[in-house]
């Protein structure tokens, strides 16, 4: 699927990316190649592949969720540049 120059410019504008004319031409070729590859992948017959299939054979890759050693409040705040009432104090993020 070949993308037009206008389509590449539109995508760049949506992404808020400024591209030169040379970059537009390069992106046009690269994005068209990617879309061609996706079209080729869509032709692969996956009718016999269960939706939940995976290839590693692993049943779980996560460790058990076990509570470990924790810092006390004093230890956690020991190196805080600013604290108040036992909590980290940071600059306001939102204006009120």
Curated annotation (Swiss-Prot):
InterPro entries found in the cross-reference section: Asp/Glu-ADT_sf_sub_c (IPR036113), GatC (IPR003837)
Q: EC number(s) on record?
A: 6.3.5.-
Q: Write the record's keywords in alphabetical order, separated by commas.
A: ATP-binding, Ligase, Nucleotide-binding, Protein biosynthesis
Its recorded reaction(s) are: L-glutamyl-tRNA(Gln) + L-glutamine + ATP + H2O = L-glutaminyl-tRNA(Gln) + L-glutamate + ADP + phosphate + H(+); L-aspartyl-tRNA(Asn) + L-glutamine + ATP + H2O = L-asparaginyl-tRNA(Asn) + L-glutamate + ADP + phosphate + 2 H(+)
Q: Name one GO biological process term.
A: glutaminyl-tRNAGln biosynthesis via transamidation
EC class of this enzyme? ligase
Example GO molecular function: asparaginyl-tRNA synthase (glutamine-hydrolyzing) activity
Stored SUPFAM superfamilies: Glu-tRNAGln amidotransferase C subunit (SSF141000)
Supply the NCBIfam families for this chain.
gatC
Task of the protein: Allows the formation of correctly charged Asn-tRNA(Asn) or Gln-tRNA(Gln) through the transamidation of misacylated Asp-tRNA(Asn) or Glu-tRNA(Gln) in organisms which lack either or both of asparaginyl-tRNA or glutaminyl-tRNA synthetases. The reaction takes place in the presence of glutamine and ATP through an activated phospho-Asp-tRNA(Asn) or phospho-Glu-tRNA(Gln).
HAMAP family assigned to the protein according to its UniProt record, in alphabetical order: GatC
Q: Which family does it belong to?
A: Belongs to the GatC family.
Q: How does it assemble?
A: Heterotrimer of A, B and C subunits.
Q: Can you name this protein?
A: Aspartyl/glutamyl-tRNA(Asn/Gln) amidotransferase subunit C
Give the source species.
Chloroflexus aurantiacus (strain ATCC 29366 / DSM 635 / J-10-fl)
The gene from which this protein is expressed is: gatC
